[in-house]
Regions:
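EAL-family c-di-GMP phosphodiesterase catalytic domain
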Residues: 1-106
Length: 106
């Protein structure tokens, strides 16, 4: 069983509490990511939460990576994470999924 928490901000439950409940992935809320290029404190918060999750075996998913600069800021400092955002693929229609996956796997 995989338990994923969506829209995580770190405000209501700690990462340690989520681990106690068997959470295996945390999808960080876009609001945490969107200003990491503007505010050092936002970047440091994302780095801390992502590393803390990764260190105890929860896979962080950083949602809303839209620019190369955002990715560069997190790629070496956020532990073992997954990234999602327009930098990698824009939203697509379900009917386009197979075609898009085939193009990505070439």
């Amino acid at each position: 069983v995989t338990i994923i928490v969506d829209h995580y901000t770190g405000n209501k439950l700690s990462i340690e509490q989520l681990k106690q409940y068997g959470v295996t992935k945390i999808k960080f809320d876009y609001q945490l990511i969107k200003n990491i290029t503007l505010y050092k404190s936002d970047l440091e918060r994302v780095q801390y939460l992502s590393r803390a999750a990764s260190d105890i075996g929860i896979k962080p998913v950083l949602i809303g990576i839209e620019t190369p600069l955002q990715y560069d800021l997190v790629k070496d400092t956020c532990g073992d994470f997954l990234a999602q955002g327009e930098l990698f693929c824009s939203p697509i229609e379900p009917s386009e999924l197979i075609t898009t996956l085939n193009k990505m796997n070439r």
